[in-house]
Amino acid sequence: MDPNTVSSFQVDCFLWHVRKQVADQELGDAPFLDRLRRDQKSLKGRGSTLGLNIETATCVGKQIVERILKEESDEALKMTMASAPASRYLTDMTIEEMSRDWFMLMPKQKVAGPLCVRMDQAIMDKNIILKANFSVIFDRLETLILLRAFTEEGAIVGEISPLPSLPGHTNEDVKNAIGVLIGGLEWNDNTVRVSKTLQRFAWKSSNENGRPPLTPKQKRKMARTIRSEVRRNKMAD
């Protein structure tokens, strides 16, 4: 096993412990608490994958951090903080919308890289909007916290979330997963649009109809689907 992978996990466990102490003292805001819950699931998944005990890893991570802090001067710390780019946390959804339980009559689940796509295939002929909570850096989507698909009535009919066992994903991973979700929902004649905030930071553009631009791969797949539908209609006639 790569020692850097182990030490990274150990430090992440200790830093999560510190953040949990902050939350316990009621010093964290909503985005802080949201990330804390998500990261806890991620750490459990990583610990299981690596075969490492979280409590033991937390103790070792504390030793690593203490050693680094002892060696680093205050001036070096100030320079590091000044040069580090700051990320922003953007929210389309309220805490209630993010934490609400939902159920699927005809569940479908697909893994798209490090992301899990879930949708209810029983939903038909609905107007659906995709909302997401995510962090942004350099005006680009950095990390997806959670994306959900809502009908006009407010029902949740789809979701994209990071896989705890595969931490880390790119902007392209998110766009590909959104393409999978849109394709699945539109198969049942639903009309899907993406929130303006998500369009802006994932695709750096926005369309009035709420549709993000398709990638060449998605365009080819859609063309194949249309040709298949045309052939079936001709055979039926």
From Swiss-Prot:
Keywords for the protein's UniProt record, in alphabetical order: Eukaryotic host gene expression shutoff by virus, Host cytoplasm, Host gene expression shutoff by virus, Host mRNA suppression by virus, Host nucleus, Host-virus interaction, Inhibition of host innate immune response by virus, Inhibition of host interferon signaling pathway by virus, Inhibition of host PKR by virus, Inhibition of host pre-mRNA processing by virus, Inhibition of host RIG-I by virus, Inhibition of host RLR pathway by virus, Interferon antiviral system evasion, RNA-binding, Ubl conjugation, Viral immunoevasion
Record-level Gene Ontology MF annotations: protein serine/threonine kinase inhibitor activity; RNA binding
InterPro entries tied to this protein: NS1, NS1A, NS1A_effect_dom-like_sf, uS15_NS1_RNA-bd_sf
Listed Pfam families: Flu_NS1
Location in the cell: Host nucleus; Host cytoplasm
Region (CPSF4-binding): 180-215
Segments for region (RNA-binding and homodimerization): 1-73
Region annotation Disordered: where it falls in the sequence: 205-237
Gene Ontology cellular component list: host cell cytoplasm; host cell nucleus
Keyword RNA-binding applies: yes
Alphabetical GO biological process terms: symbiont-mediated suppression of host cytoplasmic pattern recognition receptor signaling pathway via inhibition of RIG-I activity; symbiont-mediated suppression of host gene expression; symbiont-mediated suppression of host mRNA processing; symbiont-mediated suppression of host PKR/eIFalpha signaling; symbiont-mediated suppression of host type I interferon-mediated signaling pathway
Superkingdom, natural source: Viruses
Post-translational modification, as annotated: Upon interferon induction, ISGylated via host HERC5; this results in the impairment of NS1 interaction with RNA targets due to its inability to form homodimers and to interact with host EIF2AK2/PKR.
Motif (Nuclear export signal): 137-146
Span(s) of short sequence motif Nuclear localization signal: 34-38
Ranges of Basic and acidic residues composition bias in the record: 226-237
Region (PABPN1-binding): 223-230
The family this protein is said to belong to: Belongs to the influenza A viruses NS1 family.
Function in brief: Inhibits post-transcriptional processing of cellular pre-mRNA, by binding and inhibiting two cellular proteins that are required for the 3'-end processing of cellular pre-mRNAs: the 30 kDa cleavage and polyadenylation specificity factor/CPSF4 and the poly(A)-binding protein 2/PABPN1. In turn, unprocessed 3' end pre-mRNAs accumulate in the host nucleus and are no longer exported to the cytoplasm. Cellular protein synthesis is thereby shut off very early after virus infection.
Comment block on domains: The dsRNA-binding region is required for suppression of RNA silencing.
Oligomer status and interactors: Homodimer. Interacts with host TRIM25 (via coiled coil); this interaction specifically inhibits TRIM25 multimerization and TRIM25-mediated RIGI CARD ubiquitination. Interacts with human EIF2AK2/PKR, CPSF4, IVNS1ABP and PABPN1.
Protein name: Non-structural protein 1
Species this chain originates from: Influenza A virus (strain A/India/6263/1980 H1N1)
